[in-house]
């Protein structure tokens, strides 16, 4: 059976539910990732990419890398050292929500994205991915305000940080994306 982006979103919803029920901090990244994945699906459906089929494949391959790491770790099977560090950190109650998010974001982008892109567009085909790749980066960047608002609802210090930063946080938050 072919997996779809909707299947990915459903799987992320299950992770969020399980993490919420168990108090596992890994759910913060899963919730953020679900929001981003839904936005990518909306843009694929709207025809906002040069090659919608390729972007759907990229999104699925990219997401599966996270889902496989999550499943392996929580089934006591090996996963990459990078993901293991993220999941181990979810047990550290001294970390703030933002730190859990950044750990997940950096690991997923810095480890999984290049591998997924090379798998979907091997060799010289990678160059054809460029424009759509930048469109996804812009899409994710455009979600920053929405994400900050959602984060403020679950983590009250975010409200204060947002007011203090007064927009200066955007380049920092986009660091791994750009």
Which role fits each region the language model picked out?
Residues 6-44:
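N-terminal ordered "arm"
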Residues 1-22, 109-110, 114, 141-144:
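Short terminal alpha-helical segments
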Residues 10, 24, 43, 48, ...:
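Detector for Asparagine
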Residues 95-178:
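A contiguous, surface-oriented mixed alpha/beta subdomain in the mid-to-C-terminal portion of proteins
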Residues 4, 20-28, 47-50, 54, ...:
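Non-transmembrane, amphipathic alpha-helical segments
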């Amino acid at each position: 059976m072919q997996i779809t982006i909707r299947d990915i979103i459903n799987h992320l919803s299950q992770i969020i539910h399980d993490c919420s029920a168990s108090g596992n901090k890994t759910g913060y990244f899963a919730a953020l990732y679900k929001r981003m994945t839904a936005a990518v699906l909306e843009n694929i459906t709207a025809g906002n990419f040069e090659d919608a089929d390729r972007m759907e494949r990229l999104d699925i391959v990219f997401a599966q890398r996270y889902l496989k790491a999550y499943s392996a770790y929580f089934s006591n099977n090996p996963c990459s050292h990078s993901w293991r560090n993220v999941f181990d950190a979810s047990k550290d109650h001294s970390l703030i929500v933002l730190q859990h998010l950044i750990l997940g974001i950096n690991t997923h982008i810095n480890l999984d994205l290049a591998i997924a892109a090379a798998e979907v567009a091997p060799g010289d085909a990678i160059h054809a991915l460029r424009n759509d790749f930048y469109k996804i980066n812009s899409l994710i960047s455009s979600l920053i305000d929405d994400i900050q608002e959602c984060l403020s609802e679950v983590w009250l210090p975010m409200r204060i940080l947002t007011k203090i930063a007064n927009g200066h946080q955007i380049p920092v938050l986009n660091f791994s994306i750009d």
